[in-house]
């Protein structure tokens, strides 16, 4: 059985870069959207991904995640494309990627005692572009929206964050960390929450065969390098529906490995429509 093709948005970020590296190392095919492809390939080479693997298993689309056309090019696999094992040149209809894994988010820098963020609405804008891209694809290929073809629609996994829910239904941030955490991160948290709300709407839900929202703890420690975290076995997992995993932090490499193992390898079925919290300590 051929392995599915995975689309990555925000793959130059630590968590998703680690997930992409695992994906390529284990023989999956991937399509990644990147504003600067050379930056992405340089990061992957630091993960010991060789040029042959990059050439044979990865297609990079140059563009911005806020551009619906660039996103559309990332999601739609043309017949016979080398990195798509599910289609053949004889098939007249493109297919969609099996999974979309997105780690889009603003980048912050300290200015005095505050964090300043380069794109405070990037999650909202990227989510709007993703939905627009899929709306255009489904308008061109309405067969994807037939009830019988729901499994041909992509499974979406997005990285959000602990503490983004303004109603705080579940206190998923340790008590001693809450004031500082919300004070420093209120801008990206508001943006992540808008993203979650957009994906919860009925039309958006119909565009995917499921949505998995991953809410990691603080990502202020660790980098994207495989093996630099505590390891998959050390990750504590909870859900908003039952009980979140309350903790201080989790390395980026561990988030990427968890998404790879649970979503790419195992298919993600256990976590569909869940808001999954991840911590290590």
From Swiss-Prot:
The keyword Cytoplasm is annotated on this UniProt entry: no
Phenotype caused by lack of the gene: Leads to a reduced accumulation of pyranonigrin E.
Induction: Expression is positively regulated by the cluster-specific transcription factor pynR.
GO biological process: secondary metabolic process
Highest taxon of source: Eukaryota
Alphabetical keyword list: Oxidoreductase
Keyword field contains Metal-binding: no
InterPro entries in the cross-refs: NAD(P)-bd_dom_sf
Pathway info: Secondary metabolite biosynthesis
EC number of this enzyme: 1.-.-.-
GO molecular function terms listed in the Swiss-Prot or TrEMBL record: oxidoreductase activity
PANTHER family in the cross-refs: FLAVIN REDUCTASE-RELATED, UPF0659 PROTEIN YMR090W
Function text: Oxidase; part of the gene cluster that mediates the biosynthesis of pyranonigrins, a family of antioxidative compounds. The first step of pyranonigrins biosynthesis is performed by the hybrid PKS-NRPS synthetase that condenses 6 malonyl-CoA units to an acetyl starter unit, to form a 1,3,5-trioxotetradecane-6,8-dienyl-ACP. The enoyl reductase (ER) domain of pynA is likely to be functional during the first two rounds of polyketide chain extension, to generate the saturated C-C bonds of the alkyl side chain. PynA subsequently forms the amide bond between the acyl chain and L-serine.
Family stated for the protein in its record: Belongs to the avfA family.
Entry protein name: Oxidase pynE
Name of encoding gene: pynE
């Amino acid at each position: 059985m051929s392995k599915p093709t995975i689309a990555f948005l925000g793959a130059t970020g630590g968590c998703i870069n680690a997930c992409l590296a695992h994906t390529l190392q284990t023989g999956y095919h991937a399509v990644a959207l990147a504003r600067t492809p050379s930056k992405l390939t340089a990061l992957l080479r630091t993960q010991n991904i060789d040029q042959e693997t990059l050439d044979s298993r990865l297609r990079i689309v140059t563009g911005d995640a806020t551009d619906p056309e660039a996103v559309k090019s990332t999601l739609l696999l043309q017949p016979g494309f080398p990195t798509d094992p599910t289609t053949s040149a004889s098939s007249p209809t493109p297919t969609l990627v099996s999974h979309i894994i997105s780690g889009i988010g603003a980048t912050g820098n300290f200015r005095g005692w505050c964090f300043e963020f380069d794109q405070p609405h990037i999650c909202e804008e990227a989510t709007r572009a993703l939905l627009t891209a899929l709306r255009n694809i489904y308008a061109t290929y309405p067969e994807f929206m037939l009830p019988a073809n729901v499994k041909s629609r992509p499974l979406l996994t997005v990285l959000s964050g602990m503490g983004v829910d303004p109603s705080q239904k579940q206190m998923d941030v340790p008590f001693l960390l809450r004031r500082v955490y919300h004070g420093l991160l209120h801008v990206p948290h508001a943006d992540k929450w808008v993203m979650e709300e957009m994906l919860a709407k009925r039309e958006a839900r119909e565009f995917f065969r499921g949505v998995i929202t991953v809410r990691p703890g603080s990502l202020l420690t660790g980098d994207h390098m495989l093996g630099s975290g505590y390891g998959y076995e050390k990750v504590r997992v909870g859900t908003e529906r039952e009980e979140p995993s309350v903790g201080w932090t989790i390395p980026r490499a561990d988030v990427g490995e968890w998404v790879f193992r649970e979503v790419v390898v195992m298919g993600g079925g256990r976590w569909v429509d869940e808001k999954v919290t991840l911590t290590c300590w």
